[in-house]
Amino acid sequence: MKHTILQLQVINTRVAHQRLRQGGFTLVELAAVLVLIGVLIMISMPSIKGFFVQTRVGPAAAELQRFMTATRLLGEGDSVTPYAAINNASNLAPAMAESSVFKVNGATVAHRLGGSGVGSNGTITIGPVALGGGAMGSGLGLTLTNVNHRACPGLATTLNSVSEMISVNGTAAKTLGTNNEPGSFNAVTAQDLCVKGDNNTFVFATR
């Protein structure tokens, strides 16, 4: 009887050790799976971000298009510099305050197409520009900083209809003609001017 009890104790010990080893292997395997998932998420982050940027381009461009059209109508009159005092605090931020596309914080308008949306990173700024030989304030300009390359060239293509001048990273993608008539826009040129990442600056100007 004693021998049987001893055998049972040995068996129980072996079973306990086996369960412990199985539990250890399970934890190791679980940790490995979690690490693998983390790596896959890190690898796919740019693609995920690019997807969200692409889905926002259309709505963002449409809102800016409406804003520029409305602002141009307000600028019609006898003044040769109707946009001399245009700025974010008085014009852009109030117009976008209830936007579901942009994020407004005070006078800062984040476009959410790249960048942090803080300060001048990933934001939209409006200001007076000189167009067609006119003085400063004869036109208005919208500047979008830190735009992701996935927004190229869709953003510029949509805003082409309300812009007389478009530049991408400091290089003109559309300019006025020799007689100040609207110039031509090439989407391929705009695409070629873009660089990878949240490193693109767009300027759209009109009168």
Question: What are the roles of these predicted feature ranges?
Answer:
Residues 1, 42-45, 68, 96, ...:
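Detector for methionine-enriched segments
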Residues 1-3, 22, 34, 69, ...:
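N-terminal functional modules and adjacent low-complexity/disordered segments of proteins
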Residues 2-63:
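N-terminal single-pass transmembrane signal-anchor helix
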Residues 14, 19-21, 56, 66, ...:
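Arginine residue identity/basic-tract feature
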Residues 37, 55, 60-64, 69, ...:
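Generic alpha-helix signal with a bias toward terminal, lower-confidence helices
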Residues 49-96:
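Membrane-proximal N-terminal amphipathic helix
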Residues 80-207:
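Periplasmic/extracellular, small/polar-rich flexible segments of pilin-like filament-forming proteins
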